[in-house]
Amino acid sequence: MAYKLLFVVILVIGYLVYNQYNSDSSRRKYITFSAIVLGLQSALRNVAVGADTYNYYLKFEAVKYTTWQEVFRSFPDTYLYGDGKDPGYLLLEKIFQVFSGDFRVFLFLIAIVFFYAYAKLLSRYTNNTLEVLTVNLGYSALFYGFYSITGIRQTLSVALSILFLFSFIDKKYLKCILLFIVAFIIHKSSVFLLLVPVLYSIKKNKLLLYLYGLTFIVFLVGRNYFVNLALVASDYEAVEIPLPILLDIFYFVISLFIWKRLKYEDNREILSLFNVFCLTFAWIPLLGNDSPLMRVILYFNIYVLVLLPRAISRTSFYRNELFFCINLFFIYYAVDSH
């Protein structure tokens, strides 16, 4: 608890320092500061921290005794014969070990890639240092337990998915394709990235929200069926996974609040980003720590970090009180959980 509280305090102190200047330059400096702090928090963790960091460490060490021929053979073995998975991550480890065989340095590389994308996200969709603080605390509360201490392959894939979205928005389609290919060979769940440009391009937000609501009902009624189907497809035994009620209520309420505040947003890019995030709303019944479908939603719910402070900023009454309450909640949840 003390370790997590320390980093929360550092982020708050950074906000107090950079908020004095109230300029876009100070906002950007605070974003850089935050990315460095959160990156160090992730990279400096012990290999025993996190659900599977130690397993990743063992695999990293095993790659040292894997030949290049075996690495390249893993691609046809995986995609032609179904033997193996995510050969791109194996290739990444092997290339990295040309320069360093230290797993700690590898964790630094992962942190740099992810928090570079994180900083780009904040630079594009925040307006002031208070919004950046809210994003940082929201990350510490909602996403630290995955991106910062476990799930290295998907952490990379989600970082690439953010850059993939920006490339699509900026009409850099070749870069889009390359990012998708790299993300897919690192983690096969990245195939769901193909939904991102489709959802982003839909202009009728209200109609899409109704469709999400209908899907929500279908998934809620048939939850066990869909979750077990995903477990079987992922080569896991079909089991009953409990519904994470508090997390589901949070996303349900937050989705409605964001829509209520942003539906008259002048910035079309924000409304399109809401389309991407709001797939989380439909997916809520399928969430659960042991559900493979939880991994799918990570490509979409990350955008709640920038949409929530944006929605609060558009609230005409009790704006500061709302920021205070949500940040207090995030601090409590960040320190008390994981």
Task: Tell what function each PLM region has.
Residues 54, 58-62, 69-101:
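Short hydrophobic/aromatic helix or loop-helix immediately within or flanking a transmembrane segment
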Residues 136-137, 147-162:
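Multi-pass, polyprenyl lipid-linked donor-dependent membrane glycosyltransferases
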Residues 109-126:
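Transmembrane-helix motifs of polytopic, lipid-linked glycan transferases
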Residues 28-35, 42-70:
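Extracytoplasmic loop-helix module adjacent to an early transmembrane segment
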Residues 29, 122-141:
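Transmembrane-helix signature of polytopic, membrane-embedded enzymes
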Residues 1-38:
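Start-transfer (signal-anchor) and selected internal transmembrane alpha helices
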Residues 161-174:
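Membrane-interface transmembrane helices that cradle and orient dolichyl/undecaprenyl
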Residues 54-57, 63-68, 90, 192-303:
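Alpha-helical transmembrane segments and terminal signal-anchor/GPI-anchor hydrophobic tails
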